[in-house]
């Protein structure tokens, strides 16, 4: 089965990676591809700076679910509002729910309880794919926080289940932990760049997922790779014969960056034997055209 078809069978796809590697762009590209596979897809962003709409060519979400294409919607979530929404869902009496949310005890608990906000976001995604929410989807693509925080998010339900024990919150945490640990339901996509620090973080996250959750990611994406500069014949000194002499230094820098990419890809391959999608550097402005180009390149890699 091709990797894209395998991902399309999941109900939740969590995309994580070091900040600055193009994680949000890859999440948006995956959402677009899964929608093209016939799956009703919701893209979830939890960054308060809200940038997903720039790629999709829509208005900012502001917390609302916006249509972003055929079978594709997008939403920006604020973790605190999701926790409050969970209270309203579990406490059917509106006045009582409002009183609970306004209480100092709840405020302290919501801000300080380890893993609560992360679990609330994952629970929101689960209710959507289980058709228990007014917004419904076949698959949710979650643009998760950067690497370490992304791993903590995935581990949050299990940690919270151990901390709270029984009750509705404990039951919900255990249900979520089982859902995330099952690769039939939840897929993890790790985005990196073939540079020293991003690859090191990727290697550490792969190990962390195996240790904490007993499973590796489904897919690793190496983004923004410099193209092979061997299309020019000879060495840097020969480049000036074919191009403006001012390009020689640029071409040499290009060659060196490509060497770094190849070295780090070999290091990554030393610990990762699964699917590794390699995407080229695309010098384009952030927007729908960039998203279309990244989605096309990713689809080619996942055939």
Spell out what each predicted region is.
Residues 45, 76-78, 192, 221, ...:
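Residue-level recognition of beta-strand->loop/alpha-helix junctions
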Residues 18:
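P-loop (Walker A) phosphate-binding loop of NTP-binding proteins
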Residues 48-51, 79-83, 146-148, 194-198, ...:
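Conserved nucleotide-binding/hydrolysis micro-motifs of P-loop NTPases
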Residues 43, 142, 188-190, 220, ...:
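Structural beta-sheet core signal
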Residues 113-120, 193, 197, 256:
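Short, surface-exposed alpha-helical recognition segments that flank or form part
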Residues 2-13, 21, 26, 31-141, ...:
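Nucleotide-state-sensitive switch-loop elements of NTP-binding domains
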Residues 1-7, 181, 185, 196-303:
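C-terminal lobe/tail of nucleotide-utilizing enzymes
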């Amino acid at each position: 089965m091709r990797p894209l078809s395998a991902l399309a069978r999941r109900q939740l796809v969590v995309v994580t990676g070091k900040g600055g590697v193009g994680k949000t762009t890859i999440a948006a590209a995956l959402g677009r591809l899964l929608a093209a596979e016939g799956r009703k897809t919701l893209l979830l962003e939890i960054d308060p700076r809200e940038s997903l709409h720039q790629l999709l060519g829509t208005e900012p979400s502001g917390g609302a679910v916006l249509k972003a294409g055929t079978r594709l919607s997008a939403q920006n979530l604020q973790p605190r509002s999701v926790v409050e929404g969970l209270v309203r869902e579990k406490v059917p009496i509106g006045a009582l729910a409002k009183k609970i949310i306004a209480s100092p005890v709840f405020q302290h608990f919501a801000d300080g309880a380890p893993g609560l906000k992360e679990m609330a976001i994952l629970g929101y995604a689960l209710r959507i794919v289980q058709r228990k929410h007014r917004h419904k989807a076949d698959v949710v693509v979650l643009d998760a926080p950067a690497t370490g925080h992304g791993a903590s998010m995935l581990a949050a339900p299990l940690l919270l289940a151990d901390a709270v024990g029984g009750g509705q919150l404990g039951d919900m945490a255990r249900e979520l932990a089982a859902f995330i640990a099952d690769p039939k339901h939840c897929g993890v996509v790790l985005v990196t760049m073939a540079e020293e620090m991003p690859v090191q973080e990727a290697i550490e996250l792969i190990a962390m997922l195996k240790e904490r959750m007993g499973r590796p990611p489904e897919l690793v994406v190496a983004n923004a790779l410099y193209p092979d500069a061997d299309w020019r014949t000879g060495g840097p000194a020969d480049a000036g014969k074919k191009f403006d002499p001012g390009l020689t230094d640029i071409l040499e820098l290009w060659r060196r960056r490509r060497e770094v990419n190849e070295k780090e890809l070999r290091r990554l391959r030393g610990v990762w034997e699964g699917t590794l999608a390699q995407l080229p550097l695309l010098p384009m402005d952030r927007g729908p055209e960039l998203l279309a180009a990244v989605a096309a390149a990713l689809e080619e890699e996942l055939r």
